[in-house]
Amino acid sequence: MTALDHPQPRPGIKNIAAYVPGRESAPGVEKIWKLSSNETPLGPSPAALEAVREASQHLEIYPDGSASKLRDAIAKAHGLNPANILCSNGSDELLALLAQTYLMPGDEGIYTEHGFLVYRIQILAAGATPVVAREKDERADVDAILAAVTERTKIVFLANPNNPTGTYLPMEEVKRLRSGLPRKVLLVLDAAYAEYVRRNDYEAGVELVSSNDNVVMTRTFSKIHGLAGLRIGWMYAPIHVVDAVNRVRGPFNVNAIAIEAGTAATHDKAHVERAVEHNETWRTWLAQELEKLGLRVTPSVANFLLIHFPENGSKTAEEADAFLTARGYILRRVTGYGFPHALRLTVGTEEANRGVIAALAEFLER
């Protein structure tokens, strides 16, 4: 059979590098600590788990196509108008829908040098051209983003905080970015890790969306809420953006269990605070211990750390990854993000955190 004997994808699709999730297993290793996907070590809210059990008794019924119960809960929690909220099958779906809605061949979409790989994928999937803005000190550079804007630019994706670096832009810098963009350019603020940030100069994007017609904020229940397996995301956006995206999103894109679990998780603020406290304590401890081992760590405000290894010799990131994996500690290689000499470590349970530091110390002392 030749290539012409079966249907072919449109030009450009096969040039897209598929997203590769963090690993979750290691051959021959019985006990695994998965520290590769920035999942919360505290798991979901007990209230969310109870909501899952109750909702699972009625799976023959289609979910509410507008996810109004979840939208109302989110709106109440954040002081927003539910009409400006759109829920989704994970925030990744929103990134795809926004690209599909606002990009076409000939357009350009901008993302930063070490930004989330899904941005590039969705820009290409829409037939548009991805444009990379250089970062400075492993942080988004507003001047570089603005310099990359052309008459063909239609969308700018900014992860704030960023994955995999854990760095962030203060709100004044994000405001400066918005002010410098043409009104026709949509600024997408991906705030997947917003709940973890405890900095006075940070704001996830609510203020900018509320006061502008070309800013969108996306959020997720996959991180601090511990509902990654249910795929729940949401967007706060101007009414005209919500209306446009609603025209292309699939019907019933948020399932019934996700709606109930997300609603319950939104109400359980105590669980979120416990997760924040755990993360603050152990992220600080991990960073200090890693630096004691002589490793450079990018300062992070999220629930993960980017660890830098020597570029040469026997203590490389690749060898560290193999050593740790053989002992059950699975971290994330970030070569695709422009960091071939680094590993990303999720803040885990106390057992996982202490264990991975001990294993790294053993690796470095060999």
From Swiss-Prot:
Its EC number is 2.6.1.9. Pathway: Amino-acid biosynthesis; L-histidine biosynthesis; L-histidine from 5-phospho-alpha-D-ribose 1-diphosphate: step 7/9. CDD domains: AAT_like. The modification N6-(pyridoxal phosphate)lysine is found at K223. Its cofactor is pyridoxal 5'-phosphate. Transmembrane segments: none annotated. GO terms for biological process: L-histidine biosynthetic process. InterPro entries: Aminotransferase_I/II_large, HisP_aminotrans, HistidinolP_aminotransfase, PyrdxlP-dep_Trfase, PyrdxlP-dep_Trfase_major, PyrdxlP-dep_Trfase_small. It comes from the Bacteria. One of its GO terms (molecular function) is pyridoxal phosphate binding. Keywords: Amino-acid biosynthesis, Aminotransferase, Histidine biosynthesis, Pyridoxal phosphate, Transferase. It catalyses: L-histidinol phosphate + 2-oxoglutarate = 3-(imidazol-4-yl)-2-oxopropyl phosphate + L-glutamate. Belongs to the class-II pyridoxal-phosphate-dependent aminotransferase family. Histidinol-phosphate aminotransferase subfamily. Homodimer. This is Histidinol-phosphate aminotransferase. The lineage of its organism: Bacteria, Pseudomonadati, Pseudomonadota, Alphaproteobacteria, Hyphomicrobiales.
